[in-house]
C-alpha cells in the first residue's frame, strides 16, 4: 500500500498510491473470462470472483455460465453468496437515446474494428453479407478481402446490435431496465467502461445520468450513491450497480 514513484514526462518523480487503500486482510481476486464455461468452473473451484463482458456472448449465455459458477463454488465448499460476478459494459448515457447513439457510434465502431473475431461473428449475422461458397465457420472470413464500404456496413450493423443488446447505452430509463435485467440473472456488479474514445469532457458529463442509475438501482443497498462516491469509484475500481 505504500507510494511508488514514477517519472513524469520531464523526468521528475511522481508518487502514486493505489485507491481505495488496502485495508482487508485478504485481497479479493477476480478471474477474467471471455466466456469459456470451464473458466467459470475453475473460478468457482478456486474461490475467486469473476469479471466478464458481453463481447461475443449474450445475456442469456452469461446467465447459464453464472449458474455453472455458483454450482462450482458450492461444490468446492465455498459460500456462493460471498462471491461476485462483475459484468463489464461499455457505457454512455444521455438525455435521449438518439444522442447517446450518435455520441457512442464512431468510438464504438473503432473499438469493434480492433476485435477481428467479433467482427467476423457480426459479419456472419449481417443479412447483406455474402458468405463465400462452402464456408461454414465465421472465423474463416478474410476481413482483408472485404471492400471498404462492405466493412463499414458491417461495422454499422455490429454497432447497432451492440448498442441495443450488449452495453449500458441510451437514457437513464434504458440503463435501469438493463441493470434490473442483469440483477435477475445474478450479476452482482456492473463495471462501466467509459474510456473507449469519447472525449473526456463528454464522458464526465455523461457520469451524471450514470449516478442517477446508481441511485435508482442501489436504493437501500448501502452503496455510496453521491456523485463524489461515483467519481471516486470510477477512478478506482468498477462501480457497483
Regions found by a protein language model. Name each.
Residues 1-19, 60-184, 220-240:
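An alpha-helical appendage that flanks or caps ligand/catalytic pockets
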Residues 22-28:
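A local structural motif
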Residues 29-32, 50-53, 83-90, 190-192:
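Hydrophobic faces of well-ordered beta-strands that scaffold small-molecule active sites
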Residues 35-59, 65-66:
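A conserved active-site cap/scaffold subdomain adjacent to cofactor or substrate pockets
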Residues 46, 185-187:
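Structural motif
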Residues 48-52, 160-165, 191-197:
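Glycine- and acidic
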Residues 54-59, 192-204:
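Glycine-rich, proline-tolerant flexible connector loops at the mouths of alpha/beta enzymes
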Residues 62-70, 199-220:
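C-terminal helical cap(s) of enzyme catalytic domains, especially alpha/beta-barrels
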Amino acid at each position: 500500500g505504500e507510494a511508488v514513484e514514477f517519472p513524469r514526462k520531464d523526468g521528475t518523480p511522481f508518487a502514486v498510491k493505489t485507491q481505495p487503500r488496502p485495508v482487508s486482510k485478504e485481497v479479493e481476486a477476480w478471474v477474467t473470462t471471455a466466456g469459456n464455461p470451464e473458466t467459470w468452473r475453475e473460478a468457482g473451484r478456486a474461490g475467486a470472483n469473476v469479471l466478464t463482458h458481453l463481447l461475443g456472448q449474450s445475456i442469456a449465455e452469461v446467465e447459464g455460465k453464472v449458474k455453472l459458477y455458483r454450482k462450482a463454488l458450492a461444490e468446492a465448499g465455498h459460500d456462493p453468496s460471498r462471491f461476485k460476478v462483475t459484468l463489464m459494459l461499455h457505457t454512455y448515457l444521455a438525455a435521449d437515446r438518439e444522442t447517446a447513439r450518435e455520441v457512442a457510434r464512431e468510438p464504438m465502431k473503432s473499438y469493434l474494428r480492433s476485435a477481428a473475431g467479433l467482427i467476423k461473428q457480426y459479419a456472419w449475422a449481417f443479412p447483406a453479407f455474402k458468405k463465400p461458397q462452402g464456408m461454414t465457420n465465421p472465423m474463416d472470413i478474410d476481413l482483408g478481402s472485404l471492400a471498404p464500404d462492405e466493412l463499414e456496413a458491417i461495422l454499422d450493423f455490429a454497432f447497432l446490435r451492440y448498442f441495443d443488446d450488449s452495453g449500458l447505452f441510451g437514457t437513464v430509463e434504458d440503463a435501469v431496465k438493463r441493470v434490473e435485467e442483469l440483477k435477475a440473472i445474478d450479476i452482482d456488479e456492473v463495471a462501466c467502461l467509459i474510456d473507449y474514445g469519447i472525449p473526456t469532457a463528454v464522458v464526465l458529463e455523461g457520469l451524471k445520468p450514470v449516478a442517477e442509475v446508481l441511485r435508482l438501482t442501489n436504493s437501500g443497498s448501502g452503496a455510496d450513491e453521491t456523485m463524489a462516491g461515483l467519481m471516486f469509484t470510477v477512478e478506482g475500481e468498477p462501480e457497483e450497480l
